[in-house]
Amino acid sequence: MVVGSIQIGISIPSTLKSHYWAAVFCTAAVALTSAAFADDAFGPMAVTAAAQPFKLGPLQLIALRDAQFVMHNDGKTFGSAADVATVGNLLKASNLPDDRLTLSVNALLVRAGKRVILIDSGLGPAVHGALMASLGEAGVAPDEVTDVLITHSHFDHVGGLAGADGKLAFPKAVIRMSTAEWAWMKSQPNAAALVKVIDGHVQTFTPGAPIAPGVTSVALNGHTPGHVGYEITSGKQSLLDIGDMAHSWVISLKKPEWTMQFDNDKATAMATRKATFARLAKSHELVFAPHFPYPGVGRVVADGDAYTWVPEVP
């Protein structure tokens, strides 16, 4: 998912590509955005709001459902070193349709003492985002959120930072992202509307820095210039929110060496994916994957030269 040119691997009208951010923050354009996707079976799709609580040691976490992407299998979105048939066969081997790829859009809420921390903000109201409704299911009001941690600035992770009225969606929250990511986001012309809304509310950090008690940023390089994950530690347990280090619970794990259309630096992203999966398989650390099937919580298990995703329903 690419904030600048809005490359999400599906068919989007050219006018929407040029004016996506304006559409997100203009009430009149919200209707245009919805209409643009209405006749396309592939695209961001609405989902039922959901909030799945689970424990990490004594810490309370909640997986929040936001939306779903359905994309054509074009043989290059997730397998630019492959072809349509090769990608399709990999999907069929996991009992999935071979003509499409389905990705969830999930966010993670962490209650840490008096802090209510949201990791990523989803698509936003213009493109079927259900995050606010899912927060409601969790019993959390937008003005209770104290921190919004951003893995990276692609629109399916930052679009929900502003509401349909163009104002801050989380008015009392500090928005935190890496210094490199904020600089890159500000350089993207199509992100200008959102940058204007959140500027003055953003605090940056260097990856590796502690963000909150028990929450540390982790460099997961390659997807965007400042992409990070967040490691949450509670007692003897830990969880890594991987952001967009991986997108498909099948392809990303079975073929971590395949380059991805969405990665800014494909070679670095591939190396990060391979190294991180190897570490996670060895440590058995819990993982939150925003684009894996909701609730996106599970573990990475070694499977020969590849890996398997094992959901761990809280």
Residue ranges and their predicted role:
Residues 39-41, 53, 136, 140, 144, 184, 201, 208-210, ...:
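Metallo-beta-lactamase
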Residues 100, 104-107, 127-174:
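Active-site metal-binding motif and surrounding structural segment of the metallo-beta-lactamase
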Residues 66-67, 121-123, 153, 180-181, ...:
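Active-site metal-binding loops of divalent metal-dependent hydrolases
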